Amino acid sequence: MTSLSILLFCSAYLLGSISSAVLICRVFMLPDPRKTGSNNPGATNVLRIGGRLPAALVFIFDVLKGTLPVYVGYLLGMPPITLGLVGIAACLGHIYPLYFNFNGGKGVATAIGAMLPLGWELVSLLLACWLVIVFITGYSSLAAIISVSVAPFITWFVKPAYTAPVTMLCILIIVRHRQNIIRLMSGQESKIWDKGRTKE
């Protein structure tokens, strides 16, 4: 592992640590998403408490947090496993942000952003899967879990060399959703249009 790789890991984590949900809610004078609705600083909760515009801004920024460092590594010719670790570092920053008392989101948008340099085909299929599941069930968390679960299989067909790093990234996201899985199984999970009955 080179010093350049380590520098990119650290940069990805620090970039991921910028909580766009908290900052954008401050700009729009909305409640702190960590203390309102589902208590999750992510685009879905911001949609619940602030509407489409702030939620869209949060989603875009969170995607870029994953895309930028991975794309830099891609341009530098780093191997797939290193790019996977860069993506994981960005997601860890989002999930455990240094600047916000390590209280972050689920990392779904950032993970999507990390996969974006691998090709539009992969990300488009994952977003389509997410939208279909949300439309059918209303559960953002279930849509995220299913989407990242199929991501390694889609990657195998689109960019097989990146299957291992994408799998690592998806495992992290699924582990982060373990409480959501428990609530889904018990019927206590909130839907995307709910005003935050339970944590997201």
Curated annotation (Swiss-Prot):
Catalytic reaction equation(s): an acyl phosphate + sn-glycerol 3-phosphate = a 1-acyl-sn-glycero-3-phosphate + phosphate
EC number: 2.3.1.275
Bilayer-spanning residue ranges: 4-24, 81-103, 116-136, 153-175
Keyword Iron assigned: no
Keyword Cell inner membrane: yes
Keywords: Cell inner membrane, Cell membrane, Lipid biosynthesis, Lipid metabolism, Membrane, Phospholipid biosynthesis, Phospholipid metabolism, Transferase, Transmembrane, Transmembrane helix
Subcellular location: Cell inner membrane
Broad EC category: transferase
Bilayer disposition of the protein: Multi-pass membrane protein
InterPro entries: G3P_acylTferase_PlsY
Entry GO terms, CC: plasma membrane
UniProt pathway annotation: Lipid metabolism; phospholipid metabolism
GO biological process assignments: phospholipid biosynthetic process
GO molecular function, one term: acyl-phosphate glycerol-3-phosphate acyltransferase activity
Principal location: membrane
Annotated PANTHER family: GLYCEROL-3-PHOSPHATE ACYLTRANSFERASE-RELATED, INNER MEMBRANE PROTEIN YGIH
Family: Belongs to the PlsY family.
Subunit structure comment from the entry: Probably interacts with PlsX.
Role according to the record: Catalyzes the transfer of an acyl group from acyl-phosphate (acyl-PO(4)) to glycerol-3-phosphate (G3P) to form lysophosphatidic acid (LPA). This enzyme utilizes acyl-phosphate as fatty acyl donor, but not acyl-CoA or acyl-ACP.
HAMAP family from the UniProt entry: PlsY (MF_01043)
Name of the featured protein: Glycerol-3-phosphate acyltransferase
Species of the source: Pseudoalteromonas atlantica (strain T6c / ATCC BAA-1087)
